[in-house]
Amino acid sequence: MDDSRETLGPNAFVTGFPIKHSRSPLIHGYWLKTLGLPGSYRAHEVAPDAFPDFIASLKDGSSDFIGGNVTIPHKELAFRLADKPDDLAHELGASNTLWLEDGLLHATNTDGRGFTANLDERHPGWDRHDTAVVFGAGGASRAIIQAVRDRGFREIHVVNRTVERARELADRFGPKVRAHPVGALAEVMHGAGLFVNTTSLGMDGEAAPLIDFAPLAADAVVTDIVYIPLNTPILRQAEEQGLSVVDGLGMLLHQAVPGFEKWFGERPVVDAALRALIVADMEVH
């Protein structure tokens, strides 16, 4: 995109600390170019102690941004500082998408929508069963549990090494969510139609524990929110055991859609060319 189009605005951001690793500028830049829209989307690193001032500059109009994405470690504070967080952000206690509207700073969390949209695209019918297993109870698991519950699953078994963390999630998300220690994994997998890894196991090619997926339903789907590498050890194990798998890259791509539409006025499409662009970037960085 040439500079003249960028200076016409609107301008959006992704902020975190650090932020240089973010692929969001590549995603949104692709959409701006393919849709022929004016504006820019750029990485803007903000240290934790400077984040309240950054939000204040959005609210008072002294920055040139109309909104943007928020990533680690600012998601919880972004939620607290927003004027109008929506119901999704309220339940999660975190937001990843901000926009100015009617003089107020609005906030939502699109991670769950990215998760379900990825599965809808890559494996339609993934939600035909009513039982899911979520492996891990860290911050990343919240949006997954929320999205799976809201899609209509009746039982969501959260399995974690520290069962107290899983119990906190069960308390937060209601009676459909049940907490279990790792030792109960095989038991709670019985007949489940969805298995989601929300841990960092296998990230950057690290080893992951061996998991016997045999207790899952024969047509179950195994997915991983880790997308580096695309084919994580957990996905490889599941595929070798004859199950359908969905990698986590699409979650990153689809979670970006609602924000882009808010800032730039058109709903973008996650297509094969965008996925190929990000995969190529992953191979060199």
UniProtKB/Swiss-Prot annotation:
List of residues binding NADP(+): 87, 136-140, 160-165, 225, 248
Entry annotation: catalytic residues: 75
InterPro entries per UniProt: Aminoacid_DH-like_N_sf, NAD(P)-bd_dom_sf, SDH_C, Shikimate_DH, Shikimate_DH-bd_N, Shikimate_DH_fam, Shikm_DH/Glu-tRNA_Rdtase
Pfam families the record matches: SDH_C, Shikimate_DH, Shikimate_dh_N
Reactions it catalyzes: shikimate + NADP(+) = 3-dehydroshikimate + NADPH + H(+)
One GO CC term, this protein: cytosol
GO biological process entries: amino acid biosynthetic process; aromatic amino acid family biosynthetic process; chorismate biosynthetic process; shikimate metabolic process
Keywords per UniProt: Amino-acid biosynthesis, Aromatic amino acid biosynthesis, NADP, Oxidoreductase
SUPFAM superfamilies per the UniProt record, alphabetical: Aminoacid dehydrogenase-like, N-terminal domain, NAD(P)-binding Rossmann-fold domains
Annotated function: Involved in the biosynthesis of the chorismate, which leads to the biosynthesis of aromatic amino acids. Catalyzes the reversible NADPH linked reduction of 3-dehydroshikimate (DHSA) to yield shikimate (SA).
PANTHER family associated with the record: BIFUNCTIONAL 3-DEHYDROQUINATE DEHYDRATASE_SHIKIMATE DEHYDROGENASE, CHLOROPLASTIC, SHIKIMATE DEHYDROGENASE
Name this polypeptide is given: Shikimate dehydrogenase (NADP(+))
Gene (UniProt): aroE
